[in-house]
Amino acid sequence: LTPFGAKTTTTPAGKNAHGCLTQKKNVFEIIAAHGLPYAATASVGYMNDFLKKLERAKDIHGTRFIHVIAPCPTGWGAPESKMVDLARDVVDCGLWYLAEYEGEQESGVSGGTFTLNRKPREFTSVRDYLKSQGRFRALSDEEISLVERSRDAKWEMIERDWA
């Protein structure tokens, strides 16, 4: 699930090599589309939220899924001491959201409810978040603007469809 523009350990080497050229799949929404009893997103930067979701999932019968963002010093190209900060920053800049899905299984009809657990009043800088990691070193200003526009479109959908 490599984000747009990120280089990985398997990205071809060379001056002209660029990171991932596609948007990553939203596994949380794919899982929710299958009507599971419970799905959530979490970040190790917001441990209280993560622990609440683990407790919630523990009490639900059936398949449960929690998609956790947990930075990797080697893969992300940042010091180990910054991992929790990065896990918080990705939420605060709006590139990762904290949410839950609770499915309803009545009469064979699947459906469910999405809940946004944290909405930053104002997003922090996407540019600062991306530039703090070696994996995004090659992103141009235009590509960073594309990431920001993609984030804004995603949040418009969340606010429209999950409210």
Where are these regions (language model features)?
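Glycine-rich beta-alpha junction loops
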Residues: Y46, I69-T74
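Thiamine diphosphate
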Residues: L1-R64, E80
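Weak global preference for isoleucine
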Residues: I30-I31, I60, I66-I69, I144-V147, ...
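Flexible, low-complexity linker and terminal segments
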Residues: C72-A163
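Short, surface-exposed, polar/charged, turn-prone segments marking secondary-structure boundaries
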Residues: P12-H18, H67-A70, D92-Y97
